[in-house]
Amino acid sequence: MLRGWLRLLLDVVFPATCEGCDTTLPAGHPSCLCDACKAALGRAEGSLCERCGVPVASDSPCAACRTRPPAFGRARAAGWYVSGSVLASAVQSLKYRRRRHVADALGAHLAAHYPFPTDVVLVPVPLHPARLRARGFNQALLLARALGRRCGLPVASRALVRRRATRAQPGLDAAERRRNLRHAFRVRTPGAVAGRRVVLVDDVLTTGATADACARALLVAGAMRVDVYTVGRAP
């Protein structure tokens, strides 16, 4: 009870602001997003490629997935990651402003849009140790934990590791991204994923190259199937 009163007092003295639009939140507001921004997070829907989730004319696989099927079974996102959108602002606040609590709101948004089977294990996309030290946390792990709490699912936080540093992906085409990520990941604890259905968790899916490389490593380690779920998807 004392903790609750203390939180209310802090909200009055140091009012929280919405991570989507920077407006002041009411004291005791249960989320880091105002109601308008929560509603504006949106959903990635419409006719989507049945494999990678990119917008297509019909729900059949897109040309890229027909030409080179990804290792993962299915990729879906909670919303479209578009510059200037509430979702993009919230993700950037988490990653670059180090607002770790934003992961709870984004994890809840993802959980609200997809029914996750109870027999899956969540695996976050790992950061290289140098990047992890620089940032101080792995946003994919925070999202996986938030999703796990919401859905009652286990998180294999150390199952997948990034074995080498890679070039930054922006600016690389699809073929360059695949080469950049070749053999970049390995499964450190195969027992955590062998014979299991795995849900790979990350903040944003762009070309799917990172998800594909992770899925290949997980399948080699014995995972039965790998699906990918992210907060945002580049359209």
List each language-model region with its residue ranges:
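Glycine-rich phosphate/pyrophosphate-handling loop used in enzymes and phosphotransfer proteins
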Residues: 1-235
